[in-house]
């Protein structure tokens, strides 16, 4: 995430923009509090209640100072070019002031209220949780089928439930109005087992006809869907659990004080005794767990603070619909729209001590509730001194939602807000579009009357090499600092971006980090070569067009193309493609081709002007390539750039490369590409013939036209340098062609390689024959395997596909061996 942001920041800074990237962190309410509570229990054997709120918060701040800087260390180590003088923390004074202003303003508009709703409740942490703080895991469970007697009839309605321990809180049974089997029960009264409560059978479209029997028990106080149904049908809500997860008196005296597991066991036994348990089925279902303490989460109806979301969501939806903010990739717009169109009120209170304490005071004398931007010492209504502040804190996401403007000093009208707001782009993961992106949108639209950002660039998650989410439990996480120490921050950054496509997850392979470390070494070595050959470099020398060789013109034209492609890729957030483009150019075009050709003029040429021209092109292209690479690999590029001829103090603020039309030679570049094809053809023929590396071969080239003939005569040394050739013969199309040679054709050139004196033909023929026999055997084996219905029908599709790929590869190899054998016969 930080790497992608930094790439964009560096690119825009070099492109001449006045950029600002404000670093910072949120206070991670429950995560931080749980860590400190664990430390307190481990070191002192105490709970937070033992030491009190004030002392506990001192411990949290101390822990934050000690451990909270690790994220900053990682961000700095990876080279993020933030403005560290602007660092923000959601609990600092500037952000805290904005939090209070927003809370009170929404409260005064009637958009914040207190009420009872179902929330995710952690019985261990004793707090409500946001959905993102709940991990859902598939667990083996059961579906119990229970009979609810119909009052006044010798009949019963059968319900199916995964939670028999909540039966005592039932206030209705529900069926789908379109279920023909159940229509006869609608409106009738049934008895809730164990508590003998009379409840009505109601009709609601929410009920799934296919689930269980088609009839479900409704427990409004202990299930979010039941709560919504209870609201629609005005049902009573009976809380049968305590906040610590034990049963209370409302569950019945025989269950009062039991844990949930104990209660479930007792309820099942009692139902069996009464003959009301019909049967049990095994069932796998998702169970929510607190992401911090791993305790099973309970849906409980508790008194909390809420934000009315529908009025706020309207403008956040409209802004995206108008195009004021756009998602990249665009498919995430649908996800954003779906969440906001179906939004529920947001529970913003948490029963924690670490966080922004809710700015609401209760009067113990007159009972009034007052929200205030400043701390109150007396009741604004009756002036009583007997007041107390709400002990709960705000959801961490509440302060994070204000980040685009709170960090710039709002509610004051600061120069930063005037100059840098709204921001250009938000870079974030798809997993927090609702939790963070949508909330920043509605908060900013409400208080700034503008969108917070123009673009939302969505990236995926980094997974391990097997595609699993990284987690402590799996032990598959990576420490960016450790990887950076092993391979360098540049290699890690380049790995994270080249494996990234917008909106998609990426698999992390340490081998790719190592490969990108090798790329950094390649850049280093190429730069060192150039630097060592600049002792007589003249920065005032500017070659004319006539001074450029074919290779010069090709590399300058290629560089123009790469500048265009990389700039376009970064502008369109195709960061992975942009990185791959500059990688290919730097490694292949510049290092493997151009530098090798430039060596002739640097080492052997007595022509000073030719040497100066080579130096000019090397410096121009290398410094340009380092500039293109800089957003991706800032450390190595900055270091090398400083040792090359340059203007300005630092690469980080150097101008971004632009296309130079005066140095664009498309026709010459196309000709050079043909020359390169011919070189690669010679290399391939040598490899196929097993010509030893040390042996040079004579080559004959037959150009198809006079223009190409002139090029070949002028640059025949390219073949000697790059293709292990000692003699180059250039023939006309009317000349007799060489005998005893292998031939291949590239555009505008026939290439003949004389092999007779370079290989032992008899020995090579025997080797190829043996390889042919082995290949035929593999083809027969695979054909037999794939014709076996037992294999193709039973084996996984991926395995069958893999075997088909092998067969295709062996058939291709057989064709190549047959051609090789024919070539040997003619030598």
What is each PLM-predicted segment?
Residues 1-36, 99, 160-161, 166, ...:
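N-terminal catalytic cores of NTP/NDP-binding nucleotidyl/phosphoryl-transfer enzymes
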Residues 2-3, 157-193, 216-223, 233-239, ...:
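Extended active-site and interfacial segments that coordinate phosphate-rich ligands
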Residues 24, 157-175, 292, 298, ...:
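Conserved phosphate/anionic-ligand binding catalytic regions in large, soluble enzymes, centered on
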Residues 37-41, 60-74, 179-206, 234-235, ...:
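Conserved oxyanion/phosphate-binding beta-strand-loop segments in alpha/beta enzyme cores
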Residues 37-156, 167, 211-365, 436, ...:
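Residue patterns forming the tRNA-binding/recognition surfaces of aminoacyl-tRNA synthetases
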Residues 145, 338-398, 402, 446-489, ...:
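Feature 926 captures the class I aminoacyl-tRNA synthetase adenylation module centered on the KMSKS loop
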Residues 148-154, 177, 191-196, 363-365, ...:
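Short acidic, glycine-rich loop/turn motifs
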């Amino acid at each position: 995430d930080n790497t992608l942001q930094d790439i964009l920041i560096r690119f825009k800074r070099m492109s001449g923009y006045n950029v600002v990237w404000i670093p910072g962190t949120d206070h991670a309410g429950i995560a931080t509090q749980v860590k400190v509570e664990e430390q307190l229990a481990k070191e002192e054997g105490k709970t937070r209640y033992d030491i009190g709120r004030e002392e506990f918060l001192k411990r949290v701040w101390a822990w934050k100072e000690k451990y909270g800087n690790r994220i900053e260390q990682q961000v700095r180590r990876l080279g993020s070019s933030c403005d560290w003088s602007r660092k923000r923390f959601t609990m600092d004074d500037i952000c805290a002031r904005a939090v209070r202003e927003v809370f009170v303003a929404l409260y005064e508009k009637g958009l914040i209220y207190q009420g009872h709703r179902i929330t995710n409740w952690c019985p261990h942490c004793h707090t409500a949780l946001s959905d993102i703080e709940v991990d859902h895991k598939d667990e083996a469970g059961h579906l119990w089928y229970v009979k609810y007697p119909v009052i006044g009839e010798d009949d019963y309605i059968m319900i199916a439930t995964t939670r028999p321990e909540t039966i005592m809180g039932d206030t209705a049974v529900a069926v789908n109005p379109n279920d023909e089997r159940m229509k006869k029960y609608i409106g009738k009264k049934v008895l809730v087992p164990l508590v003998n409560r009379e409840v009505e059978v109601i009709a609601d479209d929410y009920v799934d006809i296919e689930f269980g029997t088609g009839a479900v028990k409704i427990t409004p106080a202990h299930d979010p869907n039941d709560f919504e149904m209870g609201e629609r049908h005005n049902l009573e809500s009976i809380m049968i659990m305590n906040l610590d997860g034990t049963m209370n008196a409302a569950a019945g005296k025989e269950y009062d004080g039991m844990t949930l597991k104990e209660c479930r066991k007792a309820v099942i036994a009692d139902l069996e005794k009464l003959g009301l348990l019909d049967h049990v089925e095994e069932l796998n279902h998702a169970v929510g767990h607190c992401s911090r303490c791993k305790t099973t989460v309970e849906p409980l109806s508790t008194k909390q603070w809420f934000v009315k979301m529908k009025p706020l969501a309207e403008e956040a939806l409209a802004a995206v619909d108008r195009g004021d903010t756009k998602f990249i990739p665009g498919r995430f717009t649908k996800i954003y729209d779906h969440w906001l169109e179906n939004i529920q009120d947001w529970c913003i209170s948490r029963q924690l001590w670490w966080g922004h304490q809710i700015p609401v005071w209760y009067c113990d004398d007159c009972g009034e509730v007052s929200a205030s931007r400043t701390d109150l010492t007396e009741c604004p209504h009756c002036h009583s001194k007997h007041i107390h502040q709400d002990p709960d804190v705000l959801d961490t996401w509440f302060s994070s939602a204000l980040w685009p403007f709170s960090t710039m000093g709002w509610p004051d009208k600061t120069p930063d807000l005037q100059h840098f707001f709204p921001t250009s782009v938000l870079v974030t993961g798809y997993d927090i579009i609702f939790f963070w992106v949508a909330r920043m949108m509605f908060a900013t639209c409400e208080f700034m009357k503008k969108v917070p950002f123009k673009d939302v660039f969505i990236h995926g998650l980094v997974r391990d090499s097997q595609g699993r989410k990284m987690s402590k439990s799996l032990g598959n996480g990576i420490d960016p600092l450790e990887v950076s120490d092993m391979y360098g921050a540049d290699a890690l950054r380049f790995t994270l971006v080249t494996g990234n496509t917008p909106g998609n997850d990426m698999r992390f392979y340490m081998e790719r980090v190592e490969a990108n470390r090798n790329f950094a070494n390649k850049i280093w070595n190429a730069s060192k070569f150039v630097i060592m050959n600049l002792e007589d470099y003249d920065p005032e020398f500017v070659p004319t067009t006539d001074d450029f060789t074919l290779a010069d013109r090709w590399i300058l034209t290629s560089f123009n193309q790469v500048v265009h492609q990389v700039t376009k890729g970064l502008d369109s957030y195709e960061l992975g493609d942009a990185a791959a483009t500059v990688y290919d150019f730097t490694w292949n075009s510049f290092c493997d081709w151009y530098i090798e050709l430039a060596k002739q003029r640097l080492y052997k040429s007595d022509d000073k002007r030719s040497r100066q021209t080579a130096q000019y092109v090397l410096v121009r292209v290398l410094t340009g390539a380092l500039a293109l690479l800089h957003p991706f690999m800032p450390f190595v590029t900055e270091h090398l750039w400083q040792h090359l001829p340059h203007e300005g103090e630092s690469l980080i603020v150097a101008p971004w490369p632009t296309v130079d039309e005066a140095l664009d030679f498309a026709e010459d570049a196309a000709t050079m590409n043909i020359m390169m094809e011919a070189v690669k053809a010679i290399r391939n023929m040598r490899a196929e013939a097993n010509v030893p590396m040390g042996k040079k071969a004579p080559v004959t080239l037959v150009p198809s036209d006079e223009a190409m003939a002139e090029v070949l005569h002028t640059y025949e040394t390219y073949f000697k340098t790059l293709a292990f050739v000692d003699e180059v013969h250039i023939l006309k199309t009317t000349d007799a062609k060489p005998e005893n040679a292998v031939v291949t054709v590239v555009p505008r050139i026939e290439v003949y390689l004389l092999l007779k004196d370079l290989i032992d033909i008899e020995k090579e023929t025997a080797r190829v024959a043996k390889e042919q026999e082995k290949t035929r055997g593999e083809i027969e084996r695979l054909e037999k395997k794939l014709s076996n219905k037992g294999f193709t029908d039973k084996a996984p599709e991926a395995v069958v596909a893999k075997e088909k790929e092998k067969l295709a590869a062996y058939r291709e190899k057989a064709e190549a061996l047959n051609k090789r054998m024919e070539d040997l016969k003619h030598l």
